[in-house]
């Protein structure tokens, strides 16, 4: 597998998603990834630490530059818990749980997050403003309502299908109400 190509595809997709998601400094972005799917395998069966490292490092570098927090979702064996910076967990009053990810419980993305984040911890739940799902890992449970699908121009990283979500405030009040412009659906 060409790791440079995986990094370039990740960078292109992330930039596309960020351009459409209208995130602000301090927002949270969730990343779900299956390195097995990126390499053409079945989710959870063929994890690659190197693939996870390239993807997480690429995403983390871009988000940190913009002041956006990264939350890396783990696999079902950790109940899709997330690796975040301790500072975010404290700021958002998230309950920190005691588990260390492994390649087959948490996955390559979480191992990479523990490697590249300054002070990583695991939390069970978060409410992110947007996210990227590489390999159909089901990130929706961690993105706030109302979720808006984002269709990146590039549809895959390696062999893995890619989807993305942003969010917007709920529209309440019915036909008599007036609303602010929706930055996500401005087209």
Swiss-Prot record:
Signal peptide: none
InterPro entries reported in the protein's UniProt record: Antibiotic_NAT-like, DUF436
Domain of life: Bacteria
Family classification: Belongs to the UPF0340 family.
HAMAP family from the UniProt entry: UPF0340 (MF_00800)
The protein's name: UPF0340 protein SGO_0411
Organism: Streptococcus gordonii (strain Challis / ATCC 35105 / BCRC 15272 / CH1 / DL1 / V288)
């Amino acid at each position: 597998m060409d790791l440079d190509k995986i990094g370039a595809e990740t960078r292109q997709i992330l930039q596309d998603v960020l351009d459409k998601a209208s995130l602000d400094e301090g927002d949270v972005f969730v990343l779900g990834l299956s390195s097995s799917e990126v390499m053409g395998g079945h989710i959870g069966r063929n994890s690659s630490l190197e693939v996870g490292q390239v993807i997480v490092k690429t995403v983390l570098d871009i988000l940190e530059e913009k002041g956006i927090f990264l939350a890396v979702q783990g696999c079902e064996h950790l109940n899709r818990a997330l690796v975040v910076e301790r500072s975010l967990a404290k700021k958002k009053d998230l309950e920190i749980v005691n588990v260390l990810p492994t390649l087959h419980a948490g996955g390559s993305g979480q191992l990479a997050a523990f490697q590249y984040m300054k002070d990583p911890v695991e939390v069970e739940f978060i409410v992110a403003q947007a996210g990227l799902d590489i390999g159909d890992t089901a990130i929706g449970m961690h993105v706030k309502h109302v979720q808006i699908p984002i269709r990146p121009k590039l549809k895959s990283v390696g062999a893995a299908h890619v989807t993305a979500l942003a969010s917007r405030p709920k529209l309440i009040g019915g036909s008599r109400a007036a609303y602010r412009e929706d930055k996500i659906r401005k087209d």
